[in-house]
């Protein structure tokens, strides 16, 4: 039966730049591995689950009226262990190794006519073949993250224009050996040479590098990595870095090569690097006999996308909070079926993640593992969900979270909460369950006068006592501490350098931190990091947690202010005028107030600049108005990065120091460190946030915050970190779950979900702690 909808408008032949979501539904985690597979739209290449899922394919059709889809399903192949390996006759890197693991099934159909289409139809055949050969959306997502880190260089910008001559690529081989694969062409002289050996073997004999050593020609392009849209591997041997050539089309035309006629047939350097990361062992070693692999609701693992364990451990911890999980599930049930742009909508991807992690539908042993080990008494681990769409959306435009590098889980958690708050579509802002108000007291050591300031927060840094008890192989050994001891240390006064506004003493001051309100969920970050010079070193201090996980936080409650306290005066602002410029301007006949106003407007710079400003503003109606104190106050800068604040706190600075340093250094971390260290006499009080006055705060306090005592919390989750830096190493999450009617600790290590007998491993690795308030 013919279909009138089988047209070039409805059936598109995708090019290399097209993102193809052929692995899973864009609105939920139903995938090609589930019964019934998924429907891939052949017009825009977004996918939706069919009748056996949540019918998101029908949702997509109703929104777009794209009629032609192909149902994609796959079944794992059984591994034949005694099959001899295929003889290697040439260097070959296959684009999609999944073909070795799965049998794929494709059924094209028209949703309007409700018929199955002939897969041999020429238009369908071309579209399906191009779709199969294209890079999958999940891989393209990760490759983009790696490629975003590449830049150009002076050697590319200043590449000399050579006379055009033709380089023959037919049956091309290395000029110094017979290799025809992994060929690199010199962008100076056009010489063809093989590349260096690659991770895992193969690659070449390094003759491209030898060519650079012999000639000094710095740039080469990998021929079979070039695609018609200008994507190509460029390597600068002089910089010893992979680069981007924005003028690759012009540079290739110098050698008579039109890139529009080329096709990418080999893996790029980014793909090879990604492959190495994905094959790296991110998992823990074999667990002890007391451990048990778990499956079911709330016990779904997340596949490591390559340095994404910080994201996985954070999301597992967040979705272990009942209020957060219920909120996101409700939005999933109401919003995901009406969202117009699911692949770029944060709320849609959060809802998708909620259904994936909480429902238990996808928490089951790996099909391939079961097929290849049918007689094993030990169930294989889960395959794990791959949250690449969520990672793409949440990291969009961010210089760190938009890459495939390891990141700080605490920074990511605070960043994510801010992102959710800004993009919330619900009447209830679920991130308010983490909100609380902190009070800081500054006390002059000389005159004893005090100042109180308040600010809002969603996380508190825990001071970890550091008592050295020995050394093993150059590594310091520290005494065990409890969370209660950390709480006691956190509320102790910190002494700081300070010049008092009241008594003018430079004796210093103390600051103490307390909490004016307590959130439903309290996030604590253990400050295990020490600033040694400009190097941040992680300290392996064991932190013991209570077996029952119950803690009383009354000691953190801010006390009533004593009636007999004397207060420091409100800070006033003055400016040291450029007296020389003022005298010269007055000598020209300008009144003092005009001289000052000109210098204020021009940064208190010099006579000539101020004079030019005066001539341009002689008619300003307020030019003779006396200067108000408010005009001398520094302008508030709301762009201070919370991630940068947390990074500076890891160096051992206070939040107030971090904010002040970043304000003074245009949000640059290195300059902020220099500024703080070079201003020992600066008063680093935390300025009250707008609207944070206690009277205003109490009137508008969210229903989740509490000022009631006793303040009791239950430890719900621990994000643990192995490694020397929060931006490297490996993250896992320990979460308290109900297993067989009892509260047990469960380890979430990427896709591995196991019951653990103890928290011994979390002692020296605990980094972020999530507590639930017991009301």
From Swiss-Prot:
<feature type="domain" description="UBA 1">
    <location>
        <begin position="576"/>
        <end position="617"/>
    </location>
</feature>
<dbReference type="Pfam" id="PF17807">
    <property type="entry name" value="zf-UBP_var"/>
</dbReference>
<feature type="binding site">
    <location>
        <position position="66"/>
    </location>
    <ligand>
        <name>Zn(2+) 2</name>
    </ligand>
</feature>
<dbReference type="GO" id="GO:0004843">
    <property type="term" value="F:cysteine-type deubiquitinase activity"/>
</dbReference>
<keyword id="KW-0833">Ubl conjugation pathway</keyword>
<feature type="binding site">
    <location>
        <position position="174"/>
    </location>
    <ligand>
        <name>Zn(2+) 4</name>
    </ligand>
</feature>
<feature type="binding site">
    <location>
        <position position="177"/>
    </location>
    <ligand>
        <name>Zn(2+) 4</name>
    </ligand>
</feature>
<feature type="zinc finger region" description="UBP-type 1; degenerate">
    <location>
        <begin position="1"/>
        <end position="108"/>
    </location>
</feature>
<keyword id="KW-0677">Repeat</keyword>
<keyword id="KW-0788">Thiol protease</keyword>
<feature type="active site" description="Proton acceptor">
    <location>
        <position position="730"/>
    </location>
</feature>
<dbReference type="InterPro" id="IPR016652">
    <property type="entry name" value="Ubiquitinyl_hydrolase"/>
</dbReference>
<feature type="binding site">
    <location>
        <position position="44"/>
    </location>
    <ligand>
        <name>Zn(2+) 2</name>
    </ligand>
</feature>
<dbReference type="GO" id="GO:0043161">
    <property type="term" value="P:proteasome-mediated ubiquitin-dependent protein catabolic process"/>
</dbReference>
<feature type="zinc finger region" description="UBP-type 2">
    <location>
        <begin position="151"/>
        <end position="259"/>
    </location>
</feature>
<feature type="binding site">
    <location>
        <position position="236"/>
    </location>
    <ligand>
        <name>Zn(2+) 3</name>
    </ligand>
</feature>
<keyword id="KW-0862">Zinc</keyword>
<keyword id="KW-0863">Zinc-finger</keyword>
<feature type="binding site">
    <location>
        <position position="41"/>
    </location>
    <ligand>
        <name>Zn(2+) 2</name>
    </ligand>
</feature>
<dbReference type="GO" id="GO:0005829">
    <property type="term" value="C:cytosol"/>
</dbReference>
<dbReference type="GO" id="GO:0008270">
    <property type="term" value="F:zinc ion binding"/>
</dbReference>
<dbReference type="InterPro" id="IPR038765">
    <property type="entry name" value="Papain-like_cys_pep_sf"/>
</dbReference>
<feature type="binding site">
    <location>
        <position position="25"/>
    </location>
    <ligand>
        <name>Zn(2+) 1</name>
    </ligand>
</feature>
<dbReference type="InterPro" id="IPR001607">
    <property type="entry name" value="Znf_UBP"/>
</dbReference>
<feature type="modified residue" description="Phosphoserine">
    <location>
        <position position="456"/>
    </location>
</feature>
<feature type="binding site">
    <location>
        <position position="28"/>
    </location>
    <ligand>
        <name>Zn(2+) 1</name>
    </ligand>
</feature>
<feature type="binding site">
    <location>
        <position position="194"/>
    </location>
    <ligand>
        <name>Zn(2+) 4</name>
    </ligand>
</feature>
<feature type="binding site">
    <location>
        <position position="155"/>
    </location>
    <ligand>
        <name>Zn(2+) 3</name>
    </ligand>
</feature>
<dbReference type="InterPro" id="IPR009060">
    <property type="entry name" value="UBA-like_sf"/>
</dbReference>
<feature type="binding site">
    <location>
        <position position="207"/>
    </location>
    <ligand>
        <name>Zn(2+) 4</name>
    </ligand>
</feature>
<dbReference type="InterPro" id="IPR013083">
    <property type="entry name" value="Znf_RING/FYVE/PHD"/>
</dbReference>
<keyword id="KW-0479">Metal-binding</keyword>
<keyword id="KW-0378">Hydrolase</keyword>
<feature type="binding site">
    <location>
        <position position="49"/>
    </location>
    <ligand>
        <name>Zn(2+) 1</name>
    </ligand>
</feature>
<keyword id="KW-0645">Protease</keyword>
<comment type="similarity">
    <text>Belongs to the peptidase C19 family.</text>
</comment>
<feature type="domain" description="UBA 2">
    <location>
        <begin position="639"/>
        <end position="679"/>
    </location>
</feature>
<feature type="binding site">
    <location>
        <position position="239"/>
    </location>
    <ligand>
        <name>Zn(2+) 3</name>
    </ligand>
</feature>
<feature type="binding site">
    <location>
        <position position="186"/>
    </location>
    <ligand>
        <name>Zn(2+) 5</name>
    </ligand>
</feature>
<feature type="binding site">
    <location>
        <position position="153"/>
    </location>
    <ligand>
        <name>Zn(2+) 3</name>
    </ligand>
</feature>
<dbReference type="InterPro" id="IPR015940">
    <property type="entry name" value="UBA"/>
</dbReference>
<dbReference type="GO" id="GO:0005634">
    <property type="term" value="C:nucleus"/>
</dbReference>
């Amino acid at each position: 039966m013919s279909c009138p909808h089988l047209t070039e408008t409805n059936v598109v032949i995708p090019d290399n730049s097209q993102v193809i979501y052929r692995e899973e539904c864009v609105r939920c985690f139903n995938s090609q591995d589930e019964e019934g597979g998924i429907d891939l739209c052949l017009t825009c290449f977004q996918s939706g689950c069919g009748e056996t899922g949540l019918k998101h394919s029908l949702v997509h059709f109703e929104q777009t009226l794209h009629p032609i889809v192909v149902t994609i399903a796959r079944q794992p192949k059984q591994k034949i262990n005694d099959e001899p390996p295929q003889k290697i006759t040439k260097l070959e890197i296959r684009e999609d190794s999944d073909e070795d693991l799965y049998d794929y099934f494709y059924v094209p159909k028209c949703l309007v006519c409700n018929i199955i289409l002939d897969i041999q139809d020429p238009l369908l055949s071309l579209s399906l073949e191009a779709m199969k050969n294209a890079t999958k959306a999940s891989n393209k997502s990760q490759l983009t993250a790696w490629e975003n880190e590449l830049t150009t260089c002076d050697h590319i910008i200043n590449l000399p224009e050579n006379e055009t001559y033709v380089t023959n690529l037919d049956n091309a081989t290395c000029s110094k050996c017979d290799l025809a694969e992994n060929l690199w062409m010199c962008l100076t002289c056009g010489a063809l040479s093989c590349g260096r050996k690659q991770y895992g073997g193969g690659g070449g004999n390094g003759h491209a590098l030898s060519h650079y050593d012999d000639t000094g020609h710095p740039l080469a392009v990998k021929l079979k990595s070039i695609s018609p849209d200008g994507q190509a591997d460029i390597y600068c041997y002089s910089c010893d870095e992979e680069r981007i050539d924005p003028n690759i089309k012009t540079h290739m035309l110098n050698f008579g090569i039109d890139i529009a006629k080329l096709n990418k047939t080999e893996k790029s350097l980014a793909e090879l690097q990604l492959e190495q990361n994905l094959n790296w062992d991110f998992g823990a070693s074999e667990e002890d006999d007391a451990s048990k692999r778990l499956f079911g609701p709330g016990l779904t693992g997340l596949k490591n996308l390559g340095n994404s364990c910080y994201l996985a451990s954070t999301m597992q911890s967040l979705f272990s909070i009942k209020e957060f999980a219920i909120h996101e599930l409700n939005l999933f049930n109401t919003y995901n079926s009406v969202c117009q742009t699911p692949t770029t909508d944060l709320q849609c991807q959060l809802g998708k993640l909620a259904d994936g992690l909480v429902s238990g539908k996808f928490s089951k042993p790996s099909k391939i593992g079961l097929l290849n080990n049918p007689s094993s008494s030990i169930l294989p681990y889960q395959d794990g969900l791959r949250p690449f769409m969520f990672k793409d959306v949440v990291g969009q435009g961010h210089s760190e979270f938009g890459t495939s590098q390891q990141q700080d889980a605490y920074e990511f958690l605070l960043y994510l909460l801010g992102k959710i708050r800004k993009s919330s579509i619900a009447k209830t802002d679920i991130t308010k369950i983490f909100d609380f108000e902190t009070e800081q007291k500054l006390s002059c050591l000389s005159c004893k006068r005090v100042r109180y300031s308040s600010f809002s927060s969603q996380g508190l840094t825990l001071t970890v006592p550091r008592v050295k008890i020995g050394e093993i192989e150059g590594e310091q050994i520290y005494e065990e501490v409890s969370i209660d001891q950390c709480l006691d240390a956190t509320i102790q006064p910190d002494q700081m350098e300070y010049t008092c506004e009241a008594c003018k003493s430079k004796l210093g001051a103390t600051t103490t931190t307390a909490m004016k309100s307590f959130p439903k969920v309290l996030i604590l970050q253990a400050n295990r990091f020490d600033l040694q010079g400009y190097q941040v070193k992680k300290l392996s201090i064991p932190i013991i947690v209570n077996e029952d996980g119950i803690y009383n936080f009354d000691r953190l409650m801010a006390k009533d202010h004593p009636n007999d306290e004397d207060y420091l005066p409100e800070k006033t602002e003055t400016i040291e005028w450029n007296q020389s410029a003022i005298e010269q301007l007055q000598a020209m006949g300008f009144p003092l107030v005009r001289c000052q106003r000109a210098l204020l407007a021009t940064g208190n710079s010099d006579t000539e600049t101020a004079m030019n400003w005066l001539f341009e503003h002689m008619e300003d109606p307020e030019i003779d108005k006396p200067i108000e104190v408010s005009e001398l106050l520094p302008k508030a800068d709301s762009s201070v990065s919370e991630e940068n604040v947390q990074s500076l706190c890891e160096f051992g600075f206070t939040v107030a120091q971090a904010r002040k340093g970043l304000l003074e250094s245009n949000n640059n971390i290195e300059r902020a460190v220099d500024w703080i260290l070079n201003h020992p006499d600066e008063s680093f009080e935390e300025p009250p946030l707008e609207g944070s006055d206690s009277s205003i705060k109490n009137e508008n306090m969210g229903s989740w915050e509490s000022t009631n005592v006793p303040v009791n919390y239950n430890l719900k989750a621990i994000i643990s970190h192995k490694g020397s830096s929060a931006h490297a190493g490996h993250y896992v999450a320990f979460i308290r779950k109900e297993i067989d009617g009892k509260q047990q600790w469960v380890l979430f290590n990427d896709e591995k979900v196991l019951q653990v007998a103890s928290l011994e491993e979390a002692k020296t690795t605990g980094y972020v702690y999530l507590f639930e308030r017991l009301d």
